[in-house]
Structure formats: structure tokens, C-alpha cells
């Protein structure tokens, strides 16, 4: 996996097709043609597809303490707005561990609407696709 990650980082995402057939019968010409015709990720804004459709307050996991397990969340000290470009739940859990109340918003939300939430901080999540497209 690391080798593939390094390859993609250095040379970009290659064209390829993954196929499965229980009998082992493959139309290689068709599979190769599918790969050649694939337009790639350049200019693709996948964040619009994976972002949350509406704003929500994340109420996920309780705080984890070594030797004690999960504890009740303490009163939240900081208000964070997380702009969802494909956010991972683990990131939200980390914020919770640092006593943050996290409001997750769609990636297309206007700046004025984010400011109205009066956050102590704004987090832009990572996401899929071409960063230049988002």
C-alpha cells in the first residue's frame, strides 16, 4: 500500500481497471479500453458528492481515557466549525477529546453563514478528488 501511495503522490493517479470474474474469463481488450477512456481525476469536484447535505452538531463518541475507557464528555470549551470536504469520523473524535463542540457544515456553505455560528475555530477537512477543483 505504501508503494502505491508513493507512486500516486509522485506521478499522479494511473489509469487502471480492477475486474472480477469467478470463472476467470476476462475481455482484456474491453478492460484496457475502459482504462484508456477514463478521463481521470483532474478537475473533478468529488467533495460536492461526499459532503454532508445539511449542517449538524457532531455527537459521536465519548472521550477515551487510557486505563478508564470511555468517559462522559465534559462541557465543551471550544466551538469548531468543520467544513466537510469528505471528513473522517476519527478527526471529529479528536476534536471531541480536546473538549470541542463540532458543527459540521457542507462544503458549499457561504462564509457569512459560518461566521454566524460564532466559532472559535474553523477546520477544513481533507477530501477526495482534485484539490484544485474544490
Language-model-detected regions and their locations in the chain:
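RNA-binding accessory domains that recognize and position tRNA/RNA substrates
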Residues: 1-118, 131
